Amino acid sequence: KGTIGGVKIDCIAHRYKSLRPPHMESGLRLYDMEDIIAMKLAAISDDGSRLKDFIDMAFLSTRFSLDSMLRCFERKFPFSNVLGPVKGLLYFDDINFGEKVFIPAYEYSWENIALRLRDMSLQQDHVFDTAPLARHKDCREEKVPEDNDTPGQKHGRRR
């Protein structure tokens, strides 16, 4: 983990074959989105504690259907059961809600993320039109509706 030019990064060693060849950008070797999706689903299935993985999956629902995400997982990990990620996406008890989350220009609400993950499981072939996030109030591009969440709801679920 670290930053390059103010962008947070994770450096990983991965022993599975890539679904698509990595590409170079700004001198960095980057995995293809299909590989990243498969690895995120594996992390959720195996551990399920990283809040960011769940947020990333909800955000990726604007580019990929859950069905296509699961096909990436099956291709990358052919001997794994696809039910693990499906169940993992809906099991929230192990998530570390103390993890700091920074999404430029957006505020996240766990309730919106959880709702999107549930919607993804119910509409597995659907690609969603909008991200499950609200724009920061300072951003001018889009008017944000009144926000009635408490600070505790913004940074984790109610206990």
What do the predicted segments below correspond to?
Residues 1-158:
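Compositionally biased terminal segments of proteins
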